[in-house]
């Protein structure tokens, strides 16, 4: 069965429920078709994912679609680019996503939480600007990232080997980075919110000066950053929640032991872990504890 997707219509209706008959809406000159026809095995998997979750997994799409957002300035100053994936590689990437992403959530939750559009790429890259004092100008380069989200879409990078050939550490690193981007996107869309008890513990009006002060105040490192975010003047509830979520998917229970010696960190950890399980059905400790063979 061929499912006709009008991407512009999807974008216009992105706030609507996923059971809307998007496939029946035609926009001349802007139609995507599932299956996309690049690889039969990948197309079969993608149709099954559509039937299961109501999301459109696309491996052929335009740069305009990649950068499209309904929310102005949602990227801030960040600039991203992508390299398209060869259709024959899509099945392997879907195998990896099943292992490191979908397997950790209930089908019902993902049907609600997954973005409408999931762009499958060879590589997603972030533009890095570094000031060179010698030439008194910025030098631009590109940094590979595992994923990038905008409102109701996420773009995901491929790996350069089969899932079977990936080491346990490679799978874990991929899982941790992808999960942190996914969860951050859910915070941005208010699909996941922190409970009031979590927010009430830390004082967001007082800056901290070092790591010790940060832990005593109940703030943890965000492992996706190379600096202590809470001493950088970014004391917001969302940054706090994102730091805990990223730490939870990056770290095992053993790796949490030192931070949990701080009373406020322990309180917030326990509150958030319990809240995610009862409110969303997410066993986030299991995600962090998963070590592959």
Question: Which residues are covered by each model-predicted region?
Answer:
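Structural recognition of the beta-strand scaffold that forms the well-ordered cores
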Residues: 119-120, 153-157, 242-246
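Positively charged n-region of N-terminal signal peptides that target proteins for export
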Residues: 1-5
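C-terminal motif of bacterial Sec signal peptides marking the signal peptidase cleavage site
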Residues: 12-15
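Active-site recognition of the HExxH zinc-binding catalytic motif
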Residues: 150-200
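Acidic/polar, low-complexity intrinsically disordered N-terminal segments immediately downstream
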Residues: 17-108, 251-293
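Metalloprotease/metallohydrolase-associated module, dominated by Zn2+-dependent proteases
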Residues: 202-293
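Auxiliary, metal-adjacent structural segments of Zn-dependent hydrolase domains
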Residues: 91-151
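Structured domain cores in non-transmembrane regions
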Residues: 127-172, 270-273, 277-290
């Amino acid at each position: 069965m061929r499912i006709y997707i009008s991407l512009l219509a999807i974008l216009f209706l992105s706030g609507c429920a996923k059971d809307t008959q998007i496939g029946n809406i035609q926009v001349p000159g802007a139609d995507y078709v599932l299956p996309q026809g690049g690889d039969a095995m990948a197309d079969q998997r993608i149709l099954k994912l559509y039937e299961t979750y109501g999301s459109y997994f696309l491996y052929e799409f335009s740069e305009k679609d990649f950068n499209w957002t309904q929310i102005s300035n949602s990227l801030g100053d960040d600039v991203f680019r992508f390299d398209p994936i060869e259709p024959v590689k899509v099945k392997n990437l879907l195998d990896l996503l099943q292992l490191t992403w979908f397997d950790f959530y209930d089908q019902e939750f993902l049907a609600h939480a997954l973005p409408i559009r999931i762009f499958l790429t060879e590589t997603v890259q972030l533009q890095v600007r570094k000031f060179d004092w010698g030439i008194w100008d910025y030098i631009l380069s590109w940094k590979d990232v595992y994923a990038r989200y905008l409102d109701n879409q996420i773009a995901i990078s491929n790996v350069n080997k089969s899932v079977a050939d990936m080491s346990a550490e490679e799978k874990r690193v991929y899982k941790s980075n992808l999960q942190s981007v996914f969860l951050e996107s859910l915070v941005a869309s208010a699909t996941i919110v922190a409970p009031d008890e979590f927010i009430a513990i830390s004082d967001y009006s007082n800056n901290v000066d070092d790591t010790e002060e940060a832990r005593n105040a109940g703030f943890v490192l965000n492992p996706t950053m190379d600096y202590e975010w809470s001493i950088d003047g970014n004391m917001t509830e969302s940054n706090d929640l994102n730091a805990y979520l990223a730490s939870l998917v990056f770290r095992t229970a053993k790796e949490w032991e030192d931070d949990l010696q701080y009373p406020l960190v322990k309180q917030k950890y326990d509150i958030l872990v319990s809240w995610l399980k009862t409110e969303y059905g997410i066993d986030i400790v299991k995600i962090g504890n998963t070590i592959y063979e």
